[in-house]
């Protein structure tokens, strides 16, 4: 070695690179996709578990994409006495079922320097941009009409809840939804005929997997997500307990 030259500790660089890679990996959000319709309650318990993990920095932001089997739920404003499943989200009654694309957002608002309204607007923008790709004009609404609308019909419902600094629940986009299922309730405190779907507007069914992929792209852009982990059909019990999906 010539005088004045310094040696480089390559082992230190190697360890540092590994550590840096781990940090980058851990800060990548998780996109969880369920490819068959899911029962509602197990997924509700799953969300609650993920919120606790997110608040304790055990997981990163998580986006859950799925369809549900037929179910009716009601948010904190509902005052009825029937057997509808009560949940923590805002809003009134709604229906979930096959043909409806649901996304749950487990987001740490503090880390993203956002508030609840910021999140709702990002969800709305993601949906509007997705529908625009399919030549469906839509617009966001807030307050008692929170969601995304086409003309005078509601195509996407939005309702979130916050525990600690993290959110759960999210949005439901009617793709090929059987709209007659809304007839037994007052969806979002409106008449059942207020609801519409991509299929009804366009006069044809859509491939819900393709719509999901387009929505994922819109969400990535809106939330400035450059990289992500994708997991499919995860174990609702094992996920987040130190087990890889």
UniProtKB/Swiss-Prot annotation:
Record keywords, A-Z: Acyltransferase, Cytoplasm, Transferase
EC number(s) from the headed UniProt entry: 2.3.1.181
Top-level EC class as recorded in UniProt: transferase
GO molecular function, one term: lipoyl(octanoyl) transferase activity
Main location: cytoplasm
Active site: 188
Residue numbers binding substrate: 89-96, 157-159, 170-172
Family: Belongs to the LipB family.
Note: In the reaction, the free carboxyl group of octanoic acid is attached via an amide linkage to the epsilon-amino group of a specific lysine residue of lipoyl domains of lipoate-dependent enzymes.
Protein's UniProt name: Probable octanoyltransferase 2
Species the sequence originates in: Picrophilus torridus (strain ATCC 700027 / DSM 9790 / JCM 10055 / NBRC 100828 / KAW 2/3)
Gene responsible for this protein: lipB2
């Amino acid at each position: 070695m010539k005088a004045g030259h310094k040696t480089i500790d390559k082992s230190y660089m190697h360890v540092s690179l590994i550590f840096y890679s781990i940090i980058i990996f851990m800060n990548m959000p998780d996109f969880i996709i369920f490819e068959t319709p899911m029962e509602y309650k197990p997924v509700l318990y799953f969300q609650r578990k993920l919120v606790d993990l997110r608040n304790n920095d055990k997981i990163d932001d998580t986006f859950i994409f799925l369809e549900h089997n037929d179910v009716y739920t009601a948010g904190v404003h509902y005052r009825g006495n029937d057997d509808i499943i009560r949940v923590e989200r805002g809003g009134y009654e709604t229906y979930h079922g096959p043909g409806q694309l649901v996304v749950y957002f487990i987001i740490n608002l503090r880390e993203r320097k956002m508030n609840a309204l910021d999140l709702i607007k990002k969800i709305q923008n993601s949906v509007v941009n997705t529908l625009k790709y399919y030549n469906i004009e839509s617009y966001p609404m807030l307050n008692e009409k929170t969601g995304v609308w086409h003309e005078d019909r509601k195509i996407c419902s939005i309702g979130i809840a916050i525990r600690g600094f993290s959110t759960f629940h999210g949005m439901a986009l009617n793709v090929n939804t059987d709209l007659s299922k809304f007839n037994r309730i007052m969806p979002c405190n409106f008449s059942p005929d207020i609801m519409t779907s991509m299929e009804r507007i366009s006069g044809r069914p859509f491939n819900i997997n393709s719509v999901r992929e387009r929505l994922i792209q819109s969400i990535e852009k809106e939330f400035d997500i450059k990289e992500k982990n994708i997991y499919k059909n995860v174990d609702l019990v094992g996920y987040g307990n130190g087990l890889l999906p």
